[in-house]
Amino acid sequence: MRSTPAQWDRVYWEGKHLLMNLLDIEVPMISAINGPAWRHSEIPLLCDIVLAADDVQFQDSAHFPNGMVPGDGMHIIYPLLLGWNRGRYFLLTGQVLDAPKALELGLVNELLPRPDLLPRAWALAEQLAQRPSLLLRYTRVLFTQPLKRQLLDYLGYGLALEGMSVVDRTVTPDT
């Protein structure tokens, strides 16, 4: 699939705003990942508490293996969570991380059988909701500030480079 700069402009604009808007939510966020996280898994990983089904898998199948620069936030989130070398390896190789490995590496906080996933998320949400609103708000603001700075510095640049690769790419059967 080919794309023009004008078409990519919308992706660029939406990509920059989506992640920042999620980080602007001023209460702790909980994600419950109940299926394969192969595309845009940076979104649930932006949450403060990340729960996952015990059969979940993580992979960035959309970018480098498919001829695209992983510049839409993946290049920030995965090296941050996995460590610099491990994060780049994950993005460059199309590595699949199963649920136990994701827990071991710190991508997720808890693994649960699929039927228990949403009840656990609700239980945690109810537990957090008992805390004072200022405590919740300012803890979230404190936790998200370093990530916001990285996104401000590198997300637009990454999206621009991803756009260049999308406009230029030709996907071969080997990729």
Predicted segments, located by residue:
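Glycine- (often His-adjacent) and acidic-residue-rich active-site loop
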Residues: M1-H17, F64-N66
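Glycine-rich phosphate-binding loop at the start of an alpha helix
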Residues: Y12, K16, W38-R39, V96, ...
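CoA-thioester-processing core
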Residues: L18, L22-D24, A32, A37-F90, ...
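Terminal peptide-recognition signature
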Residues: P28, P44, A102, T139
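Short acidic-hydrophobic, aromatic-tinged amphipathic segments that line or gate anion-handling sites
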Residues: L51-A52, V108-R120
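Short secondary-structure boundary segments
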Residues: D55-V56, G94, R114-P115
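Short, structured loop/turn "capping" segments at alpha-beta junctions
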Residues: W84-R88, L97-E104, P132
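C-terminal alpha-helix plus adjacent terminal tail
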Residues: G94-A99, P119, A123-E126, Q130-T175
